[in-house]
Amino acid sequence: MKGTSALLLIGFFHATISQDPGGTVVIGSLSGRKRGNLNTGGQITSNSAILGDVNAGSKLSEPPKRRNTDKTARMLENNPRIGGSLIPPPGVIMEPNPYDINPPYFVSNKNSQSTNSATNTMLQSLTSDTKTTTRTSQTSSTRASSSITQGINTMNRNSMRFNQVDRNKISGFVNSGGQIQTNPLNTNSQSSPILAAQRQITRQKSENTQGNSIVRNGGTNSLNIPSSTRRSQPPNMAVQIGQNTATFNMGTDGKVLHKFLPTNLFENINSVSKEPRNTASVPGIGGMRNPGPSISIRNIFGTNNIEGSSVQLTGSSGVFVSDPGPKGNPTDVPQFVPSGISPTVRDPNALDPFKSIRNQIVPDIKRNEVNRGNSMISAPVIDNPTNSNSMVELNSILQNVQNGFLSEALGNSNNQNNRVTNIVNQINSADPQPVRRCQFLPYRDLRTNKIDRRYFRQLVNGKWLNLKCADGAGFNETTCLCSIHLTGDAQCSPEVRLNFNDGTIQNLTPINVHIDAEGVDASKGWAHFNGSTQMKFEYFNAYDVQRDFLIKLRFKADSYIPNQSHPIVTNCVAGQENTDPSIGVFLTGNYPHKIVFILQTDKSKLLQHLIFDVPRDGWHDITYKYDGSTLTGILDGKEKSLPTEGRIENRQAVLVFGGCGNRIFRGNIDDIQIYTCIPPSHRNKG
């Protein structure tokens, strides 16, 4: 690239980059005004528009001296803290983060405290000689029609490229919203205006760590981040913390997932996933494979950078999560999960957050659109951005880029990898832009006060409904999906469970199941049927059971009617006695009495059945099971089975206990369990 120039695009701005034969990269505006130089091979020069420069080579330069230190201090003092972000997001103010101990300084205008969109936000740079104001375009509605390529291009020590640049100016290092103020973190100069301003602020407000003041510990080494300053509590912000991720929320139409795997961020978080990296995905539920450590930008900037921490960006249309590929592969891209995906049974056509985005929603990524002829990291394209969210996302991307340069500079210059990791992860943990709340809540069992992840809650028409995840999956409030892999019997739980112990007829599972049991008496701890009462489950009305189905119960018959069958449980159609049910357990009235299990599938021409002799008196345990290939019946521990295939035929009927139509049952039923899956404990036996 010697002696050439290339057009860069970041956000809605234009600028040029040129590189002289000596290796100095100059970033400037179309007007020719230089904002700062980046030398990937040596020292960085600076001018009045940049307070401190980042050197990606072997030496960090010190910022130029400023004459008006008092003014600098006042501006620093009066400007809000935005989570210690290197790039203050346009129009978004973040609350102070208690983990934000000593991040690099930045400056923003008080106007940025408003919630105006990025097109109405102005950020004022901090200089003593020149007041430089970055103005966003007044014709943003027109420029918003152009697409933003959201991503991070390949960077190394010989080249620096970005996808989009502000069409008016580049202010500072890499920033589409305003001036970036970056401190050299190894300066001990007593004349540094930053340190002078810091000492003055510290003297005035040594105890104040909240509000809009920027307060530091003071001293020449105040910009170091010792590990001893870690706190044991999570950040004081809207955040949901999972085992390996945190979801930050600030209510601007989305959310950001932040992977904070490094141990230096939270003491109880491991830097490496304990699960196997390539755990096989379980079909039908999606998101089951443990992703392992985040790729972050480590694979982009080399080996001396961030150890496993990254920000996954979002837009109004969904959430990005990480999909690490082979170690060191720099072509991994964020994976996209649409916000409309329900955490219930996954549609086979729905996007899988752990499969390649290129094969799902962006099959035609223009890999060389900006960097023609050169390799670049592919990323989704956001078309027609019309609000500040796109700018917030873009700023977050650019910040990751700058963090990479910062990490590279410190790693090469001081060879303090741990310090680099601490600094960059503190920055990353402080500034993700939360954008959307999860519309579901985990289900908490009020009896045990424990969360049961097999279920989740959704607010529908002002009422909370309890819903069930797909079999084998558990609800994860961080991903807002049923993305947890359950093991053991937790893989399969009953839709309905009744024991009548308290004299009431109530489903003991979290699922909202209406039970019509008028006249059924449960006062003795079981359900009593007198021959004119039934218990109906509308939940299974025309229910498409398909294959897996299991019912367990206990019964005791009081009387029998010769030449008549007594339905204990069926899905028979009332008023259509000539239509056989496709599911049923019957007791015959003739002596010797028998129990009959019946099944009708779409592939069986005849009604399949199993017959057991049953003693006249006493309680009896029965289990009815069909797993798609075998009908199994169990009576008091005795098991019979019949090979059968096909799906259970649907009936436009509810599931009924205690009779159907003119067929009645007199007796007691207890301990009812209904499954639409086969629990592991019943897979190799009845």
Curated annotation (Swiss-Prot):
* Subcellular locations according to the entry: Secreted
Coiled-coil blocks: none
Q: Which UniProt keywords apply?
A: Secreted, Signal
Tissue-level expression? Prismatic layer of shell (at protein level). Expressed primarily in the mantle with highest level in the mantle edge and lower level in the mantle pallium.
Listed GO cellular component terms? Answer: extracellular region
- Biased amino acid composition, Basic and acidic residues: 62-73
Concerning InterPro entries, the annotation shows: ConA-like_dom_sf
User: Which residue stretches belong to region Disordered?
Assistant: 34-73, 125-148, 201-236
Q: Where is the composition biased (Polar residues)?
A: 37-49
UniProt signal peptide: 1-18
- This chain belongs to the protein called Asparagine-rich protein
